């Protein structure tokens, strides 16, 4: 099958799969947005200002953009504690469990802009096992759209950027993947297909992603 105006995605091969967490595997947006809205009210910052730069970025990077006069590390800790204090609304997207089960045994990593503490808490909440390789936002020098997280994940897998396909949901995430010389399948769960136009392929949901393995190769087949 093929994406309109793009290469035949059945020819999209890789040796490793890197997967974003929030917005891709799970819908954590309601809880995260509530935490940020409350934080904005306490600090006199309009929620609309936060929304313009929030998605896909590390908490500390968003704070530096919207409130450079505050101590970003201190405020990030406050936001993190708020986000993980109540995860009732956090849920997996359809197809997430099946995708991760099918990937078992293949080289893979989860890459998140969130902290390791938050990522592990959310994975436990939704019932997904902790991956062997989890790269979190607090392990890297620069967050998305910088490629640091994806480069680190590939290195831990013993792969080059060209060996990897990434599953992402945000424009800044797609930019990060491209900067890491990786190919990207974007899921239009949080943004329009047009906003994700730099990706190699765009699907509506995780359930539209399928693949088969042949030796060390993983071949993606996407339902459009």
Briefly describe each language-model feature range.
Residues 2-3, 8-105, 115-120, 128-129:
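N-terminal helical cap/lid subdomain that shapes the substrate entry/recognition surface
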Residues 1-15, 107, 116-224:
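Asp-based, Mg2+/Mn2+-dependent phosphohydrolase catalytic module
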Residues 92, 111, 142:
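Residue-level marker of regulatory loop/turn positions in helix-turn-helix DNA-binding domains and
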